[in-house]
Amino acid sequence: VTAFDWYAATIRDDPATVVGTLCTALDASPVQMGRGMHGYEQSLELRGRDGVVARVLAGGVNPWPHAWASGDDTDAFVESVRGAWPDWHTVSRVDAADDFGGAGCWDRLLSECVSEAETKNLRIDQAGDWLRDGEHGRTLYIGSKSSPVRARLYEKGKQLRGDGVKDAPIDWVRLELQVRPENQAKWTLATASPSEVWGSARWSRTLSTRVLGVDVDKVDGRLWHEPDDVRAL
């Protein structure tokens, strides 16, 4: 099942309202972390019972706050943002992830990903221990770092074991699609499901069909029109 693994949004609302609403929804408290980045004045962590559940940048030259969450905290964050600001946030980054397991899983997925990359003449990069099949696992990247759409195939179980999670399944493999949308696609993906994120590029749609067995429609921000009151801001 495809799930969100990262969601970053610029929210068109007052920073104090954004922080307060998210803290209430996520059962968290804000902690000031000093100066922000990318022109923002403040950086805050929203901390729940088990740690940081979201982060917020606010103030400075940017009129609207920017917030994001990752990993297991993403779904609750997405629900909160879309529930409070369904028509008033844009997405700057969204990751969709699918998990696999079983004997031979890595080799099968690697073959499919490399085949698609070669067919579409996409850049391939590698990280991890490819020579010795080491315990820390391997990662395959499809697409360049600067591309709006990039995929990662990696041995999640081995990564977690290297991080101290000793009972993580050794054959756990994850395929992720990272999308940094441009122009009107920032609005389109603000309502997309995790599966629909795979429609962000021609090659990612094909990969979804080949690996996930799911046919998805093209994400085309040019077909989206802003409401008059949004365009006027």
What are these regions (language model features)?
Residues 1-231:
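Structured, helix-rich domain cores that form ligand/interaction pockets
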